[in-house]
Amino acid sequence: MNIIIVGAGEIGRHLAIELSRKKHQVSVIESDAKRGAELEREIEGKVVIGDGSSVNTLSEANVGECELFLALTSDNT
């Protein structure tokens, strides 16, 4: 399954790692470059550094092809 996760906090990171281990195609959008770089080493998937509400960032993560979209940020604006 092609999954996009916005937010690599505790829950988003855990889900990304577990879903990647189960061989799902995982893309994570994270605004914090350091957190994104750490996650990139932990999953077999794509990490996009950027704003999850930006059309350009969503396009870079291939949102049009995703089957499941999980918004797991603490910022709802």
Which residue ranges define each predicted feature?
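Cytosolic regulatory regions of ion transport systems
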Residues: 1-77
